[in-house]
Amino acid sequence: MVDGHLEASTRGFDVNRPPSSGGGGGAEEEQDDVAGAALSSSPNNSAGSFPMDDFSGHGLGGNDAAPGGGGGDRSCSRASDEDDGGSARKKLRLSKEQSAFLEESFKEHSTLNPKQKLALAKQLNLRPRQVEVWFQNRRARTKLKQTEVDCEYLKRCCETLTEENRRLQKELAELRALKTVHPFYMHLPATTLSMCPSCERVASNSAPATASSAATSSTAAPPAAPSSGGIAATSSSSAAAAAAPDHRPSSFAALFSSPRGFPLSVAPQAQPPTSS
């Protein structure tokens, strides 16, 4: 019975329900009276305090929900600020002078400490966060370009090594082919001047025959009859011919410097007597 009264009391004090007009008001007043009688007749005061605790809990929950609602408002405001900041970042356009100055500063220092960042932002009429973001983007672009250059260099090295490997593989295949074909061929010896026995016999037999024929021709030739006036010339020429094999002139000048073996003038021959 007490549970029924408590249920009725909780339904009677529902704050979320809008107030009704007309005859409904009398029914709610009767329910309130029944709930008050139940609370006064209850032997346990804690049971009577339950709806109050419930309402206090609702109140605390409401108070807790209020800060939560405030936090939601703050989060919404923060999101709107971020949106505003994002739109401001998107709308940021640097002039040529600002870009040139930032580039020069980046060449000097790729990173900035807080003091340098503040000074640069003040000098360029920018916010420190904008300067920091610009430097971050510039470092990323530099790193990307360097990576592309390194990738291109490594690609060329890889192509060179691939070509070299292909050439070495071809040479290795040729050497293996020569090694397998080699036993079917015999190594030719080095060129020498050796002669076969038959050629040696022919050469040895032809040499004495040549010498004997030369001697026979020299003995078979009759000596020429010397003239009366040229006896001295013949003797001198024969002496020169005999000495020629032993003393040959070594040059053209020595040939003409050697003594002549013929007379400078020929002796006149005797005229035959004429008939009178």
Swiss-Prot record:
Tissue expression: Expressed in stems, leaf sheaths and blades and panicles.
Spans traversing the lipid bilayer: none
Gene Ontology CC entries for this record: nucleus
Biased composition (Polar residues): 39-48
DNA-binding region positions on the chain: 87-146
The UniProt record lists the keyword Nucleus: yes
Region spans: Leucine-zipper: 145-189
Residue numbers spanned by region Disordered: 1-92, 214-244
Compartments, record wording: Nucleus
A GO molecular-function descriptor: sequence-specific DNA binding
Pfam family name, one: Homeodomain
Keywords: DNA-binding, Homeobox, Nucleus, Transcription, Transcription regulation
Biased composition (Gly residues): 58-73
Role this protein plays: Probable transcription factor.
Family: Belongs to the HD-ZIP homeobox family. Class II subfamily.
Name listed for the protein in its UniProt record: Homeobox-leucine zipper protein HOX11
Native source species: Oryza sativa subsp. indica
